């Protein structure tokens, strides 16, 4: 397997064009203002036209991600949302896979974490607990303020504010849940199989494609496993240090359209 470091011809194992491109959104594909550039959309359309399948993999809930990716409709792309809790079709919205937690499990995690500020994403809405300051950067969706997690709808993701100055907690499966993080000061709790690797693996199984033909882009701890599993894992230049160390290759930062630059190189090198 060979990669590229900011420049050069990007290839995956066997010097072939990737069959699947997987990209994170915030801090990776998206600009810092939360938008998708015209350049990025054009690059995604170019690789899709060459037969490469596109997967967007994000911590955002599906309803937020779809709003941001409206310009990328028509790609036949897959959407992995809520850190892998849901796999769906970007265009039609059909759900292919879902891994959720019971409200009782979430309440137990909140109690164990010391009643820090929290919010939860369910399939169609967000609930904000005591002390949570806003609804994050997840678009114009409404969020109901609650005192506790109610019974009823399963929970896709629990988000908890933690001290960003303290050493980060150990991430991974912890009993009946999985801990991950998409940014400093934020802990995300999901079902054990609600992670980007498991979710993308389900997409690949349906396509009959192996990981060796995947290129993945990311910037945060919740992308590390994905970059390690892919035939080529590419970190954007603004990625956290551990993600850059885990990656096979490095591209420009999100605000310099690093993903688009890499994809443009892929199109030019594999004609």
Where are the regions that the model predicts?
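Mg2+-dependent phosphoryl-transfer enzymes with acidic/Ser/Thr/Gly-rich catalytic loops
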Residues: 11-12, 16-20, 37, 190, ...
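Short, structured coil segments at secondary-structure junctions
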Residues: 72-75, 82-83, 114, 173-176, ...
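Short active-site oxyanion
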Residues: 51-55, 75-77, 156-157, 212-214, ...
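Active-site phosphate-binding/coordination module
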Residues: 35-135
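Asp-based phosphoryl-transfer active-site loop
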Residues: 17-34, 56, 227
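Conserved acidic, metal-coordinating active-site core of Asp-based
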Residues: 113-229, 238
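Short hydrophobic/aromatic-enriched beta-strand-loop microsegments
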Residues: 76-82, 99, 138-139, 179-180, ...
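Short amphipathic alpha-helices and their capping/turn segments at secondary-structure boundaries
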Residues: 3-15, 66-71
């Amino acid at each position: 397997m060979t990669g590229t470091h900011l420049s050069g011809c990007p290839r995956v194992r066997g010097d072939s064009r990737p069959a699947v491109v997987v990209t994170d959104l915030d801090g990776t594909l998206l600009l810092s203002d939360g938008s998708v550039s015209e350049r990025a959309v054009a690059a995604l359309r170019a690789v899709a036209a060459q037969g490469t399948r596109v997967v967007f993999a994000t911590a955002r809930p599906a309803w937020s991600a779809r709003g941001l990716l409206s310009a990328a409709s028509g790609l036949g792309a897959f959407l992995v949302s809520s850190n892998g809790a849901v796999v769906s079709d970007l265009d039609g919205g059909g759900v292919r896979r879902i891994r959720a937690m019971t409200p009782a499990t979430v309440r137990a995690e909140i109690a164990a974490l010391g009643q820090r500020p929290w919010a939860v994403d369910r399939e169609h809405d967000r609930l904000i607990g005591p002390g949570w300051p806003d609804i994050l950067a997840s678009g114009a969706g409404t969020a109901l303020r609650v005192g506790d997690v109610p019974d009823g709808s399963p929970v896709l993701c629990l988000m908890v504010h933690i001290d960003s100055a303290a050493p980060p907690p150990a991430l991974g499966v912890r009993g009946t849940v999985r801990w991950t993080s998409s940014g400093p000061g934020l802990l995300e709790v999901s079902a054990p199989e609600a992670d980007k690797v498991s979710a993308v693996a389900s997409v690949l199984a349906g396509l009959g494609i192996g990981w060796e033909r995947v290129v993945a882009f990311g910037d945060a701890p919740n992308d590390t496993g994905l970059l390690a599993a892919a035939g080529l894992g590419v970190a954007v230049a603004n990625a956290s240090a551990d993600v850059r160390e885990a990656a096979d290759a490095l591209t420009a930062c999100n605000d310099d359209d690093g993903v688009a630059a890499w994809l443009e190189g892929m199109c030019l090198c594999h004609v």
